[in-house]
Swiss-Prot record:
Job of this protein: One of the proteins required for the normal export of preproteins out of the cell cytoplasm. It is a molecular chaperone that binds to a subset of precursor proteins, maintaining them in a translocation-competent state. It also specifically binds to its receptor SecA.
Species name: Xanthomonas oryzae pv. oryzae (strain KACC10331 / KXO85)
One GO-annotated biological process of the protein: protein folding
Main location: cytoplasm
Family named by the database record: Belongs to the SecB family.
Places the protein is found: Cytoplasm
An example molecular function term from Gene Ontology annotations: unfolded protein binding
Record note on quaternary structure: Homotetramer, a dimer of dimers. One homotetramer interacts with 1 SecA dimer.
Protein name: Protein-export protein SecB
KW Zinc-finger (keyword) present: no
Cellular component annotations (GO), alphabetically ordered: cytoplasm
Xref: InterPro entries: SecB, SecB-like_sf
């Protein structure tokens, strides 16, 4: 039946016939960790906490039309030179991309997918920190479009410098 609906979306054959499509297939926690190696003494530390945030994104092609995107965040809090806590979250999603050119796929994977995953990361990091006995920390919005544009610039500069450093052919 060509009008059949699966989980609120058009059947796969219909989606391919309808043209380009971007779908969220699944969102899940891939890895999560919270450590507070100096608890409970750290709760009485009067030093100003220092926070360091590391953000990373990995993309893996699962098949012709599906990609796994993993948004990884590590938040480290130190106070008085001692680690108060380390919260690590890897939030992942499987995204369907059908009928799109490689450049459009690259843009979606680098901007829209992390934008979709980020609210899940923010909530999980905040919940972990509070469950560890610390005041909540709310990750501020991240401009993934700007990060993507910067990574494209870096890739372009690297490929240009590689082309410049290649030896000229023998004449």
């Amino acid at each position: 039946m060509s009008d059949e609906i699966l989980n609120g979306a058009a059947a796969p054959a219909d989606a391919a016939a309808a043209g380009p499509a971007f779908t969220i297939e699944k969102i899940y926690v891939k890895d999560v960790s919270f450590e507070s190696p100096n608890a409970p003494a750290v709760f009485n530390d009067a030093n100003q906490p220092e926070l360091q945030l590391n953000l990373n994104q990995k993309v893996q092609r699962l098949n012709d039309n599906a990609f796994e995107v993993v948004l990884a965040v590590t938040l480290t809090c130190t106070a008085g030179g001692k680690t108060a806590y380390v919260a690590e979250v890897q939030q992942a999603g499987v995204f369907g991309l059908v009928g799109l050119d490689p450049q459009a796929i690259d843009v979606l994977l680098g901007t829209q997918c992390p934008n979709i995953l980020f609210p899940y990361v923010r909530t999980l990091v905040s919940d972990l920190i509070q469950a560890g006995g610390f005041p909540p920390f709310y990750l501020q919005p991240i401009n993934f479009e700007a990060l993507y544009a910067e990574s494209v610039r870096q890739r372009h500069n690297e490929s240009a410098s590689l082309a410049d450093s290649e030896p000229a052919g023998n004449a």
